[in-house]
């Protein structure tokens, strides 16, 4: 009896910041892997999400948003990570937002014109478009920009047409052995996922108050005798004022962040979590490439 064929390949998800790439990845995987937040520029690492369904294994590369501004070291590195994700993939999903088209979208498009892989255009947040009459002409405009494999209007938030994207992905996976066991959903360590969860909560609860000069180091991640994990997280900010902001009045803010992060960790790790958080000022880290390397920002470049 002949063995069943298997299919496996890499799929890059690209687009300018804040168009819904991480939400789309989470929806395609059926669970939360990449951090989502209303702030642009929240994805800093190329998180690999793995989705295995029968003979098909799609390995998703979730890029940081490619963006025009490259002044700070962290932004240069994020752009470099996003650009290097476009090479060596079987398929690219280019995510744009509703009827908006910006210079940043144009820049991503220009990079994709050189890509060898076919490109699916996912027009996200179509449910938010107020003037529905504007949608068709905009889709026609997009279709004229390059030869897309397909153009799919989606809502990553509600899941509308995400299955259509998944079906196109399956169709274009080459015949190959699976790279990962079928129960894998990401190749990132639990320590890394813990830091991402804390960072998401910082973005969520501090919103526009806090600039991007915040990162999280996991200083301790150990199993305990209760069958759970003891995790110590260090939140690094650039200025004393930001430290006060993260801690909040009488520690209220950091307490909320800790409670919410712990809930998500327990759900992800399927085990009890004891989480402790500290805040420390480390000035200039977002401008210093050496500091970024020490924080693991360039481990995959």
UniProtKB/Swiss-Prot annotation:
> Can you give the residue ranges of the KH type-2 domain?
206-283
Q: Where is this region: G4?
A: 124-127
Q: Which residues bind GTP?
A: 15-22, 62-66, 124-127
Alphabetically sorted, this entry's keywords are: Cell inner membrane, Cell membrane, Cytoplasm, GTP-binding, Membrane, Nucleotide-binding, Ribosome biogenesis, RNA-binding, rRNA-binding
Q: Does the keyword Zinc-finger apply?
A: no
Region span, G5: 154-156
Q: Which GO cellular component terms are attached?
A: cytosol; plasma membrane
Cited InterPro entries: G_ERA_dom, GTP-bd, GTPase_Era-like, KH_dom-like_a/b, KH_dom_type_2, KH_sf_prok-type, P-loop_NTPase, Small_GTP-bd
Q: Where is this region: G3?
A: 62-65
- Write out the ranges of the annotated region (G2): 41-45
Give the membrane topology.
Answer: Peripheral membrane protein
Report domain Era-type G positions.
7-175
Task: Just give the chief location class.
Answer: cytoplasm
Annotated region described as G1, given as residue ranges: 15-22
Summarize subunit and interaction data from the UniProt record for this chain: Monomer.
Q: What is this protein called?
A: GTPase Era
Q: Which gene encodes it?
A: era
């Amino acid at each position: 009896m002949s063995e069943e064929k298997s299919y496996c390949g890499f799929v890059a998800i690209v687009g300018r910041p804040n168009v819904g790439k991480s939400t789309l990845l989470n929806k395609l995987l059926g669970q939360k892997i990449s951090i989502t937040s209303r702030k642009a520029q929240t994805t800093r690492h190329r998180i690999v999400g793995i989705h295995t369904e029968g003979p098909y294994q799609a390995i998703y590369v979730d890029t940081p948003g490619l963006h025009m501004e490259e002044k700070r070291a962290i932004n240069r590195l994020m752009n470099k990570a996003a650009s290097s994700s476009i090479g060596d993939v079987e398929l690219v999903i280019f995510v744009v937002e509703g009827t908006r088209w910006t210079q940043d979208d144009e820049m991503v498009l220009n990079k994709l014109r050189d890509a060898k892989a076919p490109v699916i255009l996912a027009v996200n947040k179509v449910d938010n478009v107020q003037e529905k009459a504007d949608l068709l002409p905009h889709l026609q405009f997009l279709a004229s920009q390059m030869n897309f494999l397909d153009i799919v209007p989606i809502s990553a938030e509600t899941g509308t047409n995400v299955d259509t994207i998944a079906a196109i992905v399956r169709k274009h996976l080459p015949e190959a052995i699976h790279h990962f066991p079928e129960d894998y959903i990401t190749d990132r360590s639990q320590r890394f996922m813990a830091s991402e969860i804390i960072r998401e909560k910082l973005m969520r609860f501090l919103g526009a108050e806090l600039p991007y000069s915040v990162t999280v180091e996991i200083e301790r991640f150990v199993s305990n005798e209760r069958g759970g994990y003891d995790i110590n997280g260090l939140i690094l900010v650039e200025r004393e004022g930001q430290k006060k902001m993260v801690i909040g009045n009488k520690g209220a803010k950091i307490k909320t962040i800790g409670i919410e992060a712990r809930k998500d960790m327990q759900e992800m790790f399927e085990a009890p979590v004891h989480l402790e958080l500290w805040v420390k000022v480390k000035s200039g880290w977002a401008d210093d490439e050496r500091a970024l390397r020490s924080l693991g920002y360039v481990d995959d470049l």
